Amino acid sequence: MLEINEFNAIRISLASPEDILSWSHGEVTKPETINYRTLRPERDGLFCEKIFGPTRDWECYCGKYKRVRYKGIVCDKCGVEVTRSKVRRDRMGHIKLASPVSHIWFVKGTPSRLGLLLDISPRNLERVLYFASYIITDVDDLALGNVREQMKTDFGVRRKDLEEKIIEQRGEKATRLSKDLAAMDNAMEGTLERTHEQFARQRQEIEDEANALREHLEELIGIDALADEDIVYRGTVLLEENEPVRERSLEQLEQLIDQEREKLEQRREYEIENVRLLADGERDQRQSVADAEQERLTTALIKQLEDLNKEEKDKLDRLDDIQLHRIISENEYRILRDLAPYTFKADMGAGAVRDIVSMVDLDELSNQMQAEVQSSSGQRRKKATKRLRVVEAFRKSGNRPEWMIMTVLPVIPPDLRPMVQLDGGRFATSDLNDLYRRVINRNNRLKRLMELNAPEIIVRNEKRMLQEAVDALIDNGRRGRPVSGKGKHRLKSLSDMLKGKQGRFRQNLLGKRVDYSGRSVIVVGPTLQLHQCGLPKKMALELFKPFVMRRLVDKGFAHNIKSAKRFVERVRPEVWDVLEEVIKDYLVLLNRAPSLHRLSIQAFEAKLIEGSAIQLHPLVCAAFNADFDGDQMAVHVPLSRKAQEEARRRMISTYNLLSPATGDPIITPSQDIVLGCFYLTQVRPGAKGGGKRFGSIDEALLAYTNGVVHIQAPVWIVIEDYILPGSDLREKELPSLDGVTPRVLIETSVGRIIFNNALRYQGEPKAGENGYRSPLHYRNFLVGKSGLKALIADCYRFHSQRENIIADVYQELIERFGPETSEESLLRFYASERTARLADRIKALGFKHATLGGMTFSASDVEVPDTKDAIVQETYKKVQDIEKMQRRGLITDDERYREVVTAWLDATNQIKVEVQRSLNPFGPVSMMSTSGARGNVEQIRQMAGMRGLTTDPTGRIIELPITANFREGLSVIEYFISTHGGRKGLADTALRTADAGYLTRRLVDVAQDVIVTIEDCGTTEGMWIRVSRDILASVEDRIVGRVTVAPVTNPVTGEVIFDTDSEILEDDGKHIANVLKSLDKEAQAEFGIYVRSVLTCNADYGICRKCYGRNLATGKMVEIGEAVGIIAAQSIGEPGTQLTLRTFHTGGVATDTDITQGLPRVQEIFEARIPKGKAVLAQIAGRVQIVREEEGIRRLRIVSEEVYTDEQMLPKDYRVVVKNGDAVEIGNLLAESNVDGDGRAPLVAGLAGNVYVDDDRLVIQAKDIEEHEEVIAHAARLRVKDGDLVQVGQQMTEGSSDPQEMLQLRGREAVQEYLTNEAQKVYRSQGVGINDKHIEVIVRQMLRRVRIEEPGDTELLPGELVELHELNRINASIVSQGGDPALAVPVLLGITKASLSTDSFLSAASFQETTRVLTEAAVNGKIDYLRGLKENVVIGKLIPAGTGMEQRRKLAEEAALRVAQITSTPADREVPAATPAPAVMSEPKPAPPRSFDEALNAVTNIDSGNGPKDDLFAQAMARLQAEEGRKPTLSELLGTDEDEENV
């Protein structure tokens, strides 16, 4: 087993398969858990005894070996080792995966580490891992080149063939066309010939017919005959029947024949033309068809060539796609496989990715990325930087990238994922078992399928399912739908076991349930002393049972523990006496949840009481924030002697009187006690016995006892004591009787005498004795709550000063606490005890006189003032007038609303004044309110005056007031309105309490490693504290408890008030306040005190004492080891919750402020968010111009004007060549010599600008004007006027500044001051006082990192966040080697971001985003040096804080020195001096350790076996081993047990 005190750092990294196998005790091959009949684990299953160890101590599975004597034997029958069953909590198993599986954290994380390393997008990577896409894992470049060349050749051949084919086709077409055209010509010729022949025949017919008719006519002419019938020629009648034939008829005939011939000729020509036209048309058609065919062939050729070229290009492009790590779809894979077989390998799933990752050369990749970071810009540079960060993480950590892919899956021990039997016989099991079962089932099925050579698609699907099963086991729900169990509840994976409030970190490591604890309701214990609590007997008996049993055996009441247990269980009378004895030695711790600050757990001496409730001292209620309305508290018993000692010295209530947040007393009396003391110190004129005179205090008390004088009657008494300033009655000094003790005749009351007597303690020196003056001298004034608080504070402060303690008393303290206890601790113990006794006396006095005074009140004591109705009626009239004005249009509705609200607020205030005036000052109501015991004027106003205005749920004031009060009773509408505010209070309480708790948690996380580690960091820087109107606290309050950096002098007299390195005490603060009063306003504003601050502390880890100053809880300088970060976080967070709850108590009645604004503002400040209502800041320094444009747009323009001048003297005999006011450029001629041959150079302009001639000088003036313009919102209220001069970063509009913008404009110091002041504004406005230093601690943590801009010669990366001190260390080392340092800019981180970016991965992982933090830490191989508190609590070590830290440091250094001395002595003591020493001793002596850390490392690593062989501790061990034949123990090297006990 690893001993937790033997290491001081812890490293996290990726586990290799070999590591996982080395952890494992066997392979889990079956999904079975336990046998349903025998209820014993199944062999090789998830609970296998052979792998994980026996379920019963010292017994193997089969029962062959039983008892401890067989320890270590492995049973030959069942294979189970005989050992303790608790090994089942740490023995691991493993599952050998049939196929590699990716770890989901490194795939789905942001950013994806695997994706960045391979330069694959997370989406594509996921597709590969889940078998949706292929990734090319190997490429044969030679084969691919051959395929490419072959492809080009093939396409060349195809192209040539295609071209030849087209040429051939075109030739064929041309030949066919020429043949067709020749045939057409021949056909046309034939047609023409036939036409000619036809027309020749027709002509012949005409001629023949004409000749025949001519002859016939000639015959008829010859005989003068008449036509025997109509003579017709071709349809035309030449002669009708019986008409004589003459010559004219022949002429007519000839004419007709000519006409016929002409017609025939025309027809012939027409026919020939037609034939020709038809032939030409057909020819043209054939030609165009042929041309179109040729065109089509040409187009087809071009298209085919284009297609061929495209196909070639596509195929070549596809070949180009065959690149290593290319993601391709299944379809693309098939195409490429067909295209270029045997040239590449592609695969899918985690196995493919593992092959690729294992081949990555990290060194080469790192060089590439660094070159890209330096050469690129913008997004490319950003991406390269991200990749470089991951690559460098793997290089430096020694992790191998392929370990992100698992081949072996570890199985966690079975007792961490138990299976338990329930009452009904059913079993409840951890969800992890179901998740493991799914993995094993799928893994076994995959193995079987692979053995059977199943089809690829089935195997692939099974691999994907295995991947999903492992994903669900590691982080269920990170990808896809979460795996659900029975009842649809999401199964809890390993990641779920770690993260969140119920996770391992927060549930089991940072907070554990403890034994020896109990819980009960609390009741008040008015008779208890401050250090006591009442513990019920039954509870105490149970808590201290083992101790009582032991004591019973010791005393002989029982013979053994068993009988003693029976004795206790029967509750015999002797048990109570023994319990009383036992309990005397023990303190118990009381805790009230929620534990908001360290005073929520305090130690008390237990006082046995009857009953079942714990009794609590009334004065510690404020620290616990407890009341007695049913609150419960837990009791814990510190067991060890050291725990008891710590409880007695550190945690007992007596030593926790002051609040760590403010330094004010936290055990202030309240309620009944305040009322009793107030009643006691009140003087009532006219009371019985008023005006009587007494010679001494005893006389007056006697008179009171005999009823002669009322306790509040004003009487004259002679007292021998100092009277403190502030007396409210008359007094007269009398001569001292002994010349030392003062005597005064004062007007006072018997009550005040009783009160002042209670303040004195037995053995206190007399007033004036040896100059003794204490703040507990006679108080002759009214004492209320604030008076009692001041009294306790004064008492503590007075008794914590060494000069105020009598020598004998101081000597007693030394004897009691031991001479090793520091003076500061002694003073703290003494002051605390004295103050605690005083508080107890005041408590008793207050309770007694509150009871004797009989203070109570009834409804009749609450008197309604007579003027109330008149005020209300007058306000109603005012409101009517306002509404009339609005109806007339004189005012807007918003103005009407504001006026009405103002009128009612005024009325409420008037009535409040009247209520106060009508109250009887000696009445119980007035006394309770005035004294601060209970209630305030506002509540009395609601009871006796009027409730006033209330708010609605949005926070807006309802303008209808509640004019009634509780004495009179509310009407229905008034009651309804008042419920609005009341409900808002309750809702706020519920919502904001969670917010305040979460804020506290974040604050604790960010500041948990701020511990006081050194005395002085040696810084010369600090912060100025000046008078400021913005800061509500006074300079006096802000400087007390701080240490000066520089001397402080009085500006008037010049005297040095403080030297450097002086602690400023309360009296010094008052002195400064007096100095400030003596100065005028200007001098006050200039006067400042330069003090140390945690903001400027130079300590490498934690902070130094001087920068922190006073520990407010003790009133002394902080001790080394104090966890001031936690105190700061608690101090800020605790009042946040208080403020949250406070809205509820005012009943929702309208007040000016509400924490609803306050708490979100605090979160805004500490998270460094852009605030709501962001103010405009001046980006440059200059003069403001307010530009108002049309449409109401306002612009703020800042004009920065710089004037540069260049002045040149004009020598004699020089002529100016420029005019006055001319614009000139650099190098322009201004003047030259007018003497011929003069060798003097001309004057030229050295500056571009306007030139001015001034007698014997030439002046050039240049203006550099810079402008910046902002558009201002309509609603924004300006803080600047036109023409104002503003500085960079100055706020120009009302609102809150953006701290990030302020950091850029004004730098680190301005932001520190702004954040501190803004946080304080919120708290102080709510009446909560927190010391500045607590806020400064948080702000320091927010600003402790810087962002690298230029890495120089360092190994840092651009954009990396590093701690400022770490950067300074790295730069100093680089500069000393002659390199260039890194350049960085300050960064302001919100508390959440700052917590997560801490150096400790344990702290960050236990805060938020557990899986992301652990992923990053594992990849980087981060080392956690366990410097903070959380990380040490997580691993169970002592935290590096507390009073023992310094002693442990010294002890370690002494041990290192002792070992160094051992190693420096000769190896063989008997060797004479003359004999040369062995070779080993001739080496130089080891140097003693230089630092505490080095010494501690040495001490804690003595037996680890990890250090080098010549290490000084290794030598020491070797020497002791050689001398004594054994290894030295740790205590021998560290010192004796007694030394350790003294620590």
From Swiss-Prot:
Q: Which organism is it from?
A: Herpetosiphon aurantiacus (strain ATCC 23779 / DSM 785 / 114-95)
| Reactions it catalyzes | RNA(n) + a ribonucleoside 5'-triphosphate = RNA(n+1) + diphosphate
What is the uppermost EC class here? transferase
**GO cellular-component terms in the record?**
DNA-directed RNA polymerase complex
Keyword Transferase part of the UniProt annotation: yes
The note on cofactor binding and number reads:
Binds 1 Mg(2+) ion per subunit. Binds 2 Zn(2+) ions per subunit.
**E.C. number:** 2.7.7.6
Record note on quaternary structure: The RNAP catalytic core consists of 2 alpha, 1 beta, 1 beta' and 1 omega subunit. When a sigma factor is associated with the core the holoenzyme is formed, which can initiate transcription.
Q: What is this protein called?
A: DNA-directed RNA polymerase subunit beta'
Which InterPro entries does the record cross-reference, listed alphabetically?
Answer: DNA-dir_RpoC_beta_prime (IPR045867), DNA-dir_RpoC_beta_prime_bact (IPR012754), RNA_pol_asu (IPR000722), RNA_pol_N (IPR006592), RNA_pol_Rpb1_1 (IPR007080), RNA_pol_Rpb1_3 (IPR007066), RNA_pol_Rpb1_3_sf (IPR042102), RNA_pol_Rpb1_4 (IPR007083)
Keywords assigned by UniProt, alphabetized? DNA-directed RNA polymerase, Magnesium, Metal-binding, Nucleotidyltransferase, Transcription, Transferase, Zinc
Please tell me where Mg(2+) binds in this chain.
627, 629, 631
Residues noted as binding Zn(2+) 2 in the record, renumbered to the chain: 1017, 1097, 1104, 1107
Q: Which residues bind Zn(2+) 1?
A: 60, 62, 75, 78
Q: Which cofactor does it need?
A: Mg(2+); Zn(2+)
What is its biological role?
DNA-dependent RNA polymerase catalyzes the transcription of DNA into RNA using the four ribonucleoside triphosphates as substrates.
What is an annotated GO biological process for this record, any one?
Answer: DNA-templated transcription
Tell me the classification of the organism that encodes this protein: Bacteria, Bacillati, Chloroflexota, Chloroflexia, Herpetosiphonales
Instruction: From the UniProt entry, list the residue stretches annotated as the region Disordered.
Output: 1466-1490, 1522-1543
Q: State the family it belongs to.
A: Belongs to the RNA polymerase beta' chain family.
**Gene (UniProt):** rpoC
Checking Pfam families in the record gives: RNA_pol_Rpb1_1, RNA_pol_Rpb1_2, RNA_pol_Rpb1_3, RNA_pol_Rpb1_4, RNA_pol_Rpb1_5
